[in-house]
A protein has these predicted regions:
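Structured loops at beta-to-helix junctions and adjacent beta-edge loops in soluble globular domains
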Residues: 48, 154-157, 164, 170, ...
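Positively charged N-terminal leader segments that act as targeting/secretion signals
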Residues: 13-15
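Carbohydrate-binding surfaces of carbohydrate-active enzymes
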Residues: 17, 37-42, 50-58, 70-71, ...
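Generic start-of-chain signal for non-secretory N-termini
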Residues: 17-47
């Protein structure tokens, strides 16, 4: 009797365990299916010609046939329709309608070309919002100008400055001294910004104007589609220069130190000191200003309007380029719902950047990490190289690929705009299956565990103090000497050079990566 009772209890327990296992397997399968849909590739759809309804609808159906999950609508070189004009919004309306019909997600992009934040060059036309930098000119004789920041004298030898002293107007030099003239240089108008200017992305008023003329315009036209048909918005390559309006007042308010008295430390090793507290404070302040002026308000605007915020910053390749262009990549992308990065070409091995971005995603509690990939790889980029480039990123935590890019047209200079093209202009587009494979690979990375590090500690402070003179990257030898991980930088450069040689000489289509 006791044996029978034990046997019955064992059978019940076994059935319960089997039920739980089946339920767990079913839940995992359902989770995997959901992730495959959300992790499918999203190409940059380059609007670079005269936009016409029938052609827009045709190309969206091609994206569906290729297995993509959606697309980023991206104004690019060659656009013959007025950006943010009446025809632009009509083309968007057509594209959103067709995407809804075929089950794709149309994502917005916040700029004409890139980098985000200049409003097609319009914002910088207000000189208060214009990009600027702090510069130094070394002269043998004094040259005093009324609009300069400050003047110094000192004994200069290469990057070493000894016995610097601040000068007043009309002061003479002593024997052996050089004259250092510090001034602000404003960005010039250029064709890339349609005859306008790059904006100052550390200026909160400039970025409020950017949101008003771009984001609010989209909300007025398509706000009812936000969060449903239109899932989110892409920001591309925001970055900061070395100066902003009232920088000296902001610096003193933040640190209690008069910045103008210490300008030489931004450019030179003063009295033999490689490290400078002023240099560290300046790099840190630039990162804080970019974050508070750009990342925070755009992120808050997106959440208020039901949009996911994604994209990447400029110069995330390593800590040297990050210090120069943003101060800190991780501080910026932590405000994104889907943190991202840009892996240019098919042999740029920026492992640190991928690990940093994946670490931010984990800290934010999300599994989605976006990579804009393959820009500049050339028209001859083979499928096996694309697979290899995606696989190592999956292993380190990337789950969604923004494939660069799908040309609307190849007319004129558009064909030279950072190929390859992955849409119907490429002979292998029907065989590529990048969208479907991207969904499976991304889902595996999202549901499983990557080979990457769970947490990345960004040790940027030393580089802020040692290697960020004028917010610029130091010479290669200095960068390798002063930056943490200098040996890894050298190894990566050798791998990069080897990759270039491999792709010039490739003759092995069966290469397994």
């Amino acid at each position: 009797k006791n044996l029978n009772c034990c046997f019955i209890q064992w059978k019940k327990k076994r059935r319960m365990l089997e039920y739980r296992r089946q339920r767990t397997d079913k839940e995992k399968e359902e989770q995997m299916t959901r992730q495959i849909i959300t992790c499918r590739g999203l190409p940059f759809w380059s609007w670079n010609g005269k936009l016409e309804e029938n052609e827009l609808r045709r190309q969206i159906r091609i994206f569906r046939e290729m297995g993509f999950g959606g697309f980023f609508i991206h104004a690019r070189t060659g656009l013959a329709t007025d950006y943010l004009g009446k025809e632009w919004f009509e083309a968007l309306r057509v594209s959103i309608d067709e995407a809804r019909k075929v089950g794709l997600q149309p994502w917005l992009y916040d700029e004409d070309r890139y980098a985000s934040g200049s409003g097609a060059g319009e914002i910088g036309k207000n000189i208060h919002f214009r990009r600027r930098s702090v510069e130094v000119k070394v002269l043998k004789e004094p040259e005093y100008r009324t609009d300069d920041l400050a003047w110094f004298a000192g004994k200069l030898s290469g990057t070493m400055l000894a016995e610097p002293r601040r000068l007043e107007t009309g002061a003479d030099l002593r024997p052996g001294e050089s004259f250092l003239r510090f001034y602000v240089k404003f960005a010039e108008a250029d064709s890339w910004n349609n005859g306008g200017y790059y904006s100052d992305m550390m200026n909160p008023d400039a970025m409020r104007e950017f949101i008003r003329m771009t984001h609010e315009h989209y909300a007025a036209e398509f706000g009812e589609e936000f969060g449903s048909v239109i899932p989110g918005l892409f920001t591309d390559e925001p970055n900061c220069s070395t100066w902003t309006e009232n920088m000296e007042q902001k610096f003193e308010a933040r640190y209690g130190v008069p910045l103008l008295d210490h300008l030489p430390e931004l450019f030179f090793e003063v009295d033999g000191c490689e490290c400078s507290k002023i240099r560290w404070q300046m790099a840190n302040l630039r990162a804080e200003l970019l974050e508070s002026a750009f990342a925070v308000p755009v992120s808050e605007w997106c959440r208020k309007h039901g949009l996911l915020y994604t994209g990447h910053v400029f110069g995330e390749e390593n800590t040297v380029t990050q210090t120069k262009n943003t101060g800190s990549v991780m501080r910026f992308v932590r405000h994104m719902d889907i943190p991202g990065l840009d892996v240019l070409s098919d042999h740029q091995l920026i492992y640190e950047a991928v690990l940093q971005t994946a670490s931010v995603a984990r800290q934010n509690g999300t599994s989605r990490v976006l990579s804009e990939s393959f820009a500049g790889s050339g028209w001859d980029l083979p499928l096996f190289a694309q697979k290899a480039g995606m696989d190592w990123q999956y292993a380190l935590g990337v789950t969604v690929f923004c494939v660069h890019h799908a040309f609307y047209t190849l007319r004129g200079e558009a064909k030279r705009d950072f190929p390859p093209g992955i849409s119907f202009q490429s002979p292998y587009w029907k065989q590529a299956g990048g969208g479907r494979r991207g969904g499976r690979g991304g889902a595996s990375a999202a549901c499983g565990s990557s080979a990457g590090i769970d947490l990345v500690l960004e040790a940027s402070g030393r580089l802020f103090a040692e290697g960020s003179r004028d917010g610029d990257a130091p010479p290669a030898a200095s960068a390798q000497r002063s930056a943490p991980g200098g040996d890894r930088i050298r190894l990566r450069r050798r791998a990069y050079d080897g990759g270039k040689r491999f792709h010039r000489e490739r003759a092995a289509p069966d290469w397994k990566g």
